[in-house]
Amino acid sequence: WCHVMAHESFEDLQVAEVLNRYFVAVKVDREERPDVDAVYLRVCQALTGGAGWPLTIIMTPEQQPFFAGTYLPKNGVGGRIGLLQLLRAVAGKWSGSREELLRAGRDATAALRAMPRTEPAPLNEELLKKAAGQLAASYDAEYGGFGSAPKFPSAHDLIFLQRYAYHTGDKAAKEELENTLRQMYKGGIYDHFGGGFARYSTDREWLAPHFEKTLYDNAMLALCYTEAWQNSRMALYRQVAEATLDYCLRELRADSGGFYCGQDADSGGEEGAHYLFTPAEVKKLLGEDDGRHFCECYDITDEGNFHGKSIPNLLLNTRWSFVPEGYAEFRERLRDYRAERTPLAADTKLLASWNGLMLMALSRAARAFDSSRYLAAAERLAEFMRSGFGLGADMRACAYGGETRFPAQLDDYAFSALGFLELYRASFDPVHIISAAKQAEQITARFAAPSGGFYRTAQDAEQLITRPMEVFDGAMPSGNSAAAQLFVSLARLTGEERWRAAAEKQLEFMAGYGAEQPAGMAFALCAMMELIYPTKELVCAAADEEEPAMLAAVRAKYAPELEVLLKTPSSAETLAAAAPFTADCAPRGGKAQFYICTGGQCSLPVTE
């Protein structure tokens, strides 16, 4: 609808004439300015009871909003006001009854600034059970996922279910997770020929997506499927994770090593045209017999399932998990064909927060799959993030056209730091722990709210009509959820009490804030589990630079209760600076020693 309104109204001369005569029109990219987006989404929710995009706000010169809405047609239809009608009505009222609009703006601004206070709450399993129950209540047992159409992947909900089932043995949570992962793979929301997932499904079956692909969705889903493979060793999950990461590396990676925001849904002005096929096209490329069998496999029919053409999917294929191996070459040929037939445009912005998520996904896959290719991509991305976006107080949020823009916000610091920590787990280079700690220090120093939690913007950022704070997760985890996970991970990897105290304070704030709707902060609950359930750290003090075979096997497993650190002669000094509790861990007699630690206190070592 953003594209529709842009073409229908903002590219229309009649609309432009009215806008320019009576208003100062400002079009905001919500990805470049998520703080502005967050503030005015709350305005729309307060004034209308709902919110979404495109978001239309009319405000006074003092930035006080008095009208909010989402998509508006150029001309009124079916009792719905049109944009032209609205603009003329507001312009008339501004001339004749301005005080009424000013008063409405003041009232809306005052309501926006009145943020409810919540008391911290203790951490306990009941909150986890309540969240699992809320997800179960909206679970679609037939097609997987949660809620009805439109249906979103919500990878952070799935990651929560994975960890909750692991810690508690909850069979229902495990089934919800695994059925959803399978059904999303079978559907048209997954790109069977090129890898990666579309933004959301317009139906409950996951068949017909909104075809836009975004970096953050694919990074989070790659992470989710990688974790699922670590936990189950089901080959399908690894296949999907690798195909999704390979899509990002092939289609979204910039020359700098960073990653673009995503690819458009439209091709040649037609929604989804890039992804649609007819049997005739397939048979022309693959031959009559191979093409016919391939079409039967992927539900490509003469009737089509989307405006007369077909979205490839496996929903009707009872042998969906046994797609012939030889079809991999066919899928690649069709992928190359469609790239020339209907090329896609990319959104070539690079965002620090989204690249942090991609760093997490690449690093986790490098560790889980023992992949030097993914590790090299992750290290190159980390280098770009340090040099391109920067670290510390001068970090920038966005890179575009060779320039960096806008001061970094909470999400940028939190997700980049989590990415650095995942890269440490994959590479054992302790400099990444130090980078993550520097980012975390910026969060605690510049983003903290007096009553708990963290604002989206720093204390020295541009002042909007209110300072936004998001606690609940949305399409991606909230900055507050990410900060909670960051503090917990730093506490475990460094052994420093300051990070454990920060983690407890943040999670107690979130437990109080989200007491009635804990499923809305699923990513934070993953961090909470690390404080509720027993954890341990394994420090390997190696006699040389080689990673012991036993350690490689241990760290490839799914074990959220275990952190692994490797100390070699070359990394010993830097690791001791990053994680002081490892200073006394040393090899003996030319052999590696393994130390089991909890809370920075280590037991006597054992030999491999």
Predicted features and spans:
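Replace the tail clause
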Residues: 1-368, 507-608
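Inter-helical turn/loop segments and adjacent helix faces that build the functional surface
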Residues: 164-168, 228-236, 365-372, 423-430, ...
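Glycine-rich, acidic and aromatic/proline-enriched surface loops and short helix-turn segments
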Residues: 183-190, 380-388
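Catalytic nucleophile-loop/oxyanion-hole region of alpha/beta-hydrolase
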Residues: 237, 374, 404-407
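Long, polar/charge-rich, low-hydrophobicity segments
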Residues: 250-253, 383, 387-414, 419-575
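Glycine-rich phosphate/oxyanion-binding loops and their immediately adjacent helices
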Residues: 362, 367, 377, 419-420
